[in-house]
Amino acid sequence: MSDFEPFYDVSRSYEDNYEQGPFGAFAEALKDGNGADAAGTTSEGASEGALATFLGQPVNLPFGIPAGPLLNSRFTTAAFHMGFDLATYKTVRSRAWGCNPFPNVLAVHPKSADGSLTPGSAELDEGVLADTNYEQPISISNSFGVPSQSPDVWQPDMRAAIEAAGPGQVLVPSFQGSRVEGMSEEEYIADHATTARLVKETGAKLMVMNTSCPNAVSYTHLRAHETSLHLV
């Protein structure tokens, strides 16, 4: 690993990152209050100098961090302080949802010198070497299972994350529905709506539905292929 210290520490569990993170420069930004207003100035009524808009919201620069590594309000606030004007709050659910077993992130090492995978290569069937040798440049594979705190935890924390946005900055909540054993398709769709309503209750001005994990229900049944569900 290089001297660069990531703000999400892959050598720690997801739970430890949630409780103790962020790390590195993000931790320093959170401690020192560098960058955007560290006092938690809200962006409402204070974005006259914004240079662009994102889904109708004024932003300084429509560039940020997508759903994934910003686990809670400490992470999103640190991202704001580091100058990312769009910070996406890690995908939430209508219920608590555990993380997949550790380790959740591994470096992958294709055999080719340039790191590419060739059509027809045996690696496509046999897999590639995956380990904790995080050398630069780096390619990774990850498996978290889209964990979530319960709404009793994430709703107040999301409110704090929204309030920490500075002028020209926007907190973007991410959400998804949860499919559990015995749930009908109608109930699955309704769970998406329930989770969106829970997000709206935090005062969020916009939100994004996470469809990046189409195999979250079954490794052989991709929900994203079912246009009949009318999730959007």
Predicted regions and their residues:
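Short, acidic/polar
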Residues: 71-79, 188-197
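Aromatic/hydrophobic pocket-lining residues that form the small-molecule binding cavity
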Residues: 154, 188, 192, 228
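Conserved small/polar residues in nucleotide/adenosyl-binding loops
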Residues: 220-227
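Residues at the N-termini of beta-strands
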Residues: 86, 206-208
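Short, structured patches in soluble enzyme cores that scaffold and shape functional sites
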Residues: 175-177, 210-213
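N-terminal capping/small domains of soluble enzymes
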Residues: 1-170, 177-180
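Short, electropositive alpha-helical surface patch
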Residues: 175-195, 223
